[in-house]
């Protein structure tokens, strides 16, 4: 059986604002974008193999996304510091283990599991 692959779609109201957040503050790079009639509608951002598709095509769905992003745990303190330096608001949460929660400008949430998730075998 072949390897499965997914790219989650996050619905946003303002694609340019979302791209600035993910690229300038969260450290993603833009892989591609699609425009029609001079308006950007879809963009893909990526960082370390994590790919997200951002779209403003269905604004009524904006803010309803939740993405669980696993990092190498040794990277977590550095990632947190880089987010804080870039002005990203971080909330500490709990999902059976500590998580770091980041919310984009549209309310989509990114969950980053904490150190004890590996001990629980949930990474």
Name every feature range the model reports, one short phrase each.
Residues 2, 9-51:
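Core segments of cupin and vicinal oxygen chelate
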Residues 29-32, 54, 88-91:
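A short linear hydrophobic-aromatic micro-motif
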Residues 13-16, 67-109, 114:
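Vicinal oxygen chelate
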Residues 1-19, 66-69, 116-123:
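N-terminal beta-strand motif that seeds the catalytic metal site of vicinal oxygen chelate
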Residues 49-53, 107-110:
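Short, charged/polar, Gly/Pro-enriched secondary-structure boundary elements
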Residues 37-41, 62-63, 95-98:
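Short acidic/glycine-enriched loop/turn segments that link adjacent beta-strands
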């Amino acid at each position: 059986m072949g390897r499965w692959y997914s790219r989650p779609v996050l619905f946003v109201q303002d694609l340019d604002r979302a791209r600035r957040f993910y690229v300038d503050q969260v450290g993603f790079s833009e892989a591609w974008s699609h425009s029609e009639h001079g308006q950007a509608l879809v963009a893909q951002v990526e960082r370390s193999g994590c790919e997200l598709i951002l779209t403003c095509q269905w604004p009524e769905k904006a803010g309803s996304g939740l993405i669980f992003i696993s990092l190498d745990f040794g990277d977590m303190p550095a990632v947190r510091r880089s987010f804080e330096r870039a002005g990203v608001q971080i909330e500490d949460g709990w999902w059976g283990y500590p998580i770091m929660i980041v919310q984009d400008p549209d309310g989509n949430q990114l969950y980053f599991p904490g150190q004890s998730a590996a001990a629980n075998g949930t990474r």
